[in-house]
């Protein structure tokens, strides 16, 4: 059975993608930010996914941190034997007008929304090359094309 790793799958679009892929027969590796609230949400998503008869596991990691991504990918590979699909879904917003935006607000959004894609594609891409198969989907936003007031950092990251 194929395995999909979805980043930011504890809520929103990521949760919906996890549930749909489970319905389609994929085993599901749910990544969530390592916090109690995100873990509780991820457990609810996992319960729904398991109702489709697939194997599901939670993998807490801050995907903006390369070392945490590396450990997560190793753990997913160990648990499921490989990774057939990666969905780069994790994303955050820290809205504010540019002249009032702190460098920390800007950097946090870029790290999660952009650097995480690099981290995951580099690590999972290597797994997929060794397997000689795999699929990667990276989510974007219309904000990356048109921008939104107060979302300079988010728009730049998408």
Where are these regions (language model features)?
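The beta1-alpha1 cofactor-binding region of Rossmann-like NAD(H)/NADP(H)-dependent oxidoreductases
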Residues: 60-72, 103
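Conserved glycine-rich Rossmann-like NAD(P)H-binding loop of the short-chain dehydrogenase/reductase
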Residues: 26-42
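Active-site helix of classical SDR
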Residues: 121, 157
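Active-site loop immediately N-terminal to the catalytic Tyr-X3-Lys motif
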Residues: 99, 146-152
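Residue(s) in the substrate-gating loop at a strand-loop-helix junction
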Residues: 141
């Amino acid at each position: 059975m194929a395995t999909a790793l979805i980043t930011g799958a504890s809520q929103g679009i990521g949760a919906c993608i996890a549930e749909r892929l489970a319905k389609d027969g994929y085993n599901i590796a749910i990544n969530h930010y390592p916090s109690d609230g995100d873990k509780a949400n991820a457990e609810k998503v996992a319960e729904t996914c398991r109702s489709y008869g697939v194997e599901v596991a939670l993998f807490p990691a801050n995907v903006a941190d390369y070392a945490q991504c590396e450990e997560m990918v190793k753990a997913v590979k160990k648990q499921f034997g490989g990774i057939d699909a990666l969905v780069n879904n994790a994303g955050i917003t820290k809205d504010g007008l540019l002249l009032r935006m702190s460098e920390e607000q800007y950097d946090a959004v870029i790290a999660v929304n952009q650097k995480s894609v690099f981290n995951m594609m580099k690590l999972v891409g290597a797994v997929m090359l060794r397997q000689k198969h795999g699929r990667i989907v990276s989510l974007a936003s219309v904000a990356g094309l048109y921008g939104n007031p107060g979302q300079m950092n988010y728009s730049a990251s998408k």
